[in-house]
UniProtKB/Swiss-Prot annotation:
<comment type="similarity">
    <text>Belongs to the intercrine alpha (chemokine CxC) family.</text>
</comment>
<dbReference type="InterPro" id="IPR001811">
    <property type="entry name" value="Chemokine_IL8-like_dom"/>
</dbReference>
<comment type="subunit">
    <text>Monomer, dimer, and tetramer. Interacts with CXCR3 (via N-terminus).</text>
</comment>
<comment type="function">
    <text>Pro-inflammatory cytokine that is involved in a wide variety of processes such as chemotaxis, differentiation, and activation of peripheral immune cells, regulation of cell growth, apoptosis and modulation of angiostatic effects. Plays thereby an important role during viral infections by stimulating the activation and migration of immune cells to the infected sites.</text>
</comment>
<dbReference type="GO" id="GO:0070098">
    <property type="term" value="P:chemokine-mediated signaling pathway"/>
</dbReference>
<dbReference type="GO" id="GO:0042127">
    <property type="term" value="P:regulation of cell population proliferation"/>
</dbReference>
<dbReference type="GO" id="GO:0051281">
    <property type="term" value="P:positive regulation of release of sequestered calcium ion into cytosol"/>
</dbReference>
<keyword id="KW-0145">Chemotaxis</keyword>
<keyword id="KW-0395">Inflammatory response</keyword>
<dbReference type="GO" id="GO:0042118">
    <property type="term" value="P:endothelial cell activation"/>
</dbReference>
<dbReference type="GO" id="GO:0008009">
    <property type="term" value="F:chemokine activity"/>
</dbReference>
<dbReference type="GO" id="GO:0051607">
    <property type="term" value="P:defense response to virus"/>
</dbReference>
<keyword id="KW-1015">Disulfide bond</keyword>
<feature type="disulfide bond">
    <location>
        <begin position="30"/>
        <end position="57"/>
    </location>
</feature>
<dbReference type="GO" id="GO:2000406">
    <property type="term" value="P:positive regulation of T cell migration"/>
</dbReference>
<feature type="disulfide bond">
    <location>
        <begin position="32"/>
        <end position="74"/>
    </location>
</feature>
<keyword id="KW-0964">Secreted</keyword>
Length: 98
């Protein structure tokens, strides 16, 4: 093999190995694909999880797990109903804490 061809071949291999770990596009990964704006009864919620905005997902996510069937519903944090629900949930929680 020609020495200059071997050098070019090695440079190409080095260039390819350097680009292997670089992502082509940044993907946004949020937990909630569909956001529910419908009413939710506080008694029906078993667990309420608030996930703040981060680098992987630019929006705040509120995930409610229902008591009856463990169904998870993504709630709209901008909805007036959900804001009232969050306020009631935090008041209920603060009353329980000693």
């Amino acid at each position: 093999m020609n020495p200059s061809a071997a050098v070019i071949f090695c440079l190409i291999l080095l260039g390819l190995s350097g680009t292997q770990g670089i992502p082509l596009a940044r993907t946004v990964r949020c937990n909630c694909i569909h956001i529910d704006d419908g009413p939710v009864r506080m008694r029906a919620i078993g667990k309420l999880e608030i996930i703040p905005a981060s680098l992987s997902c630019p929006r705040v996510e509120i995930i409610a797990t229902m008591k009856k069937n463990d169904e998870q519903r993504c709630l709209n944090p901008e909805s007036k109903t959900i804001k009232n629900l969050m306020k009631a949930f935090s008041q209920k929680r603060s009353k329980r804490a000693p």
